[in-house]
Amino acid sequence: MFKKVILVAVILLSVFSLFLFFPKKITPEKIENKINQTVEKIDEVKETIIPKPTVILESGLPNKHLISTVFVEQSPEKNWDQPWQDACEEASLLTVDFYYTNKTTTSEFTKESILNMISFEETRNYTHDMNISQMATVGEDYLGYKSEIIDNPTIDQIKKYISQNIPVIVTANGKTLYAENKHFKSGGPYYHSAVILGYDDDKQQFIVHDVGTQFGAYFHYSYSLLIESIHDFPDSGKKEDINSGQKRVLILLK
């Protein structure tokens, strides 16, 4: 009963703030955006207070699942000069490594870990932008995992790995992701990497650690947008050709 009272109070406060904090001159678009944001917040609070039970679907997969692990930022000190500007691949690999090894981290430890990985990559003559195959090599030879590269991954394939507590590393067109993640600067990077840690069929969303912004922990992307964004680094070697890159994801296994 007490939980229900809290829920009702949160809903009423959210609706009240909709009108209290709006300026006098507003557009229908702003009203709609504010309403959508309020509804999302209410859903989040409802899920926290009264979580919906997990349901096993006919496919054998649960309708939702989430892997919990530490968030690794590609720019732990908010310095966006090189190598941090292009350290999303390293941060994604470390996200999986820290999950499997149950590590916690600090900005200093993250910085040191990224720089050590880059030093290894330099022995292989890798550039700032690694493709999936190169990331797999780093995962194997530097971090000590087995790797699998999945071509043309489907939503169900990704969900199957996640449901088994296996994170999925993606490389993607950040400008496509920008449609749902306005925390990116300059419309998002051409080439980006992130780690899928969860999914929610009710919301039709993947849950990722998007290492590219400080707000990227457990960030939600729609199934359709994230699948659309997935591309390996293009064979041309030019980031601008990202949409010509093959659709691949990387799995690291203990």
Regions found by a protein language model. Give the residues of each.
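Active-site-adjacent structural segments surrounding the nucleophilic cysteine of cysteine proteases
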Residues: 2-132, 181-187, 202
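Residues that form generic nucleotide/phosphate-binding pockets
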Residues: 48, 117, 138, 142, ...
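Stable alpha-helical elements in mature extracytoplasmic
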Residues: 84, 89-96, 110, 131-139, ...
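Short, flexible active-site-adjacent loop segments at beta-strand->alpha-helix junctions, enriched
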Residues: 94, 174, 212
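Mid-length scaffold segments of soluble, non-membrane domains
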Residues: 123-156, 160-165
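Repeat-unit-sized solenoid/scaffold elements
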Residues: 128-129, 165-183, 230-250
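Active-site-adjacent substructure of cysteine-protease-like catalytic cores
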Residues: 153-207
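Noncatalytic regulatory segments and standalone regulatory/sensor domains
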Residues: 187, 199-254
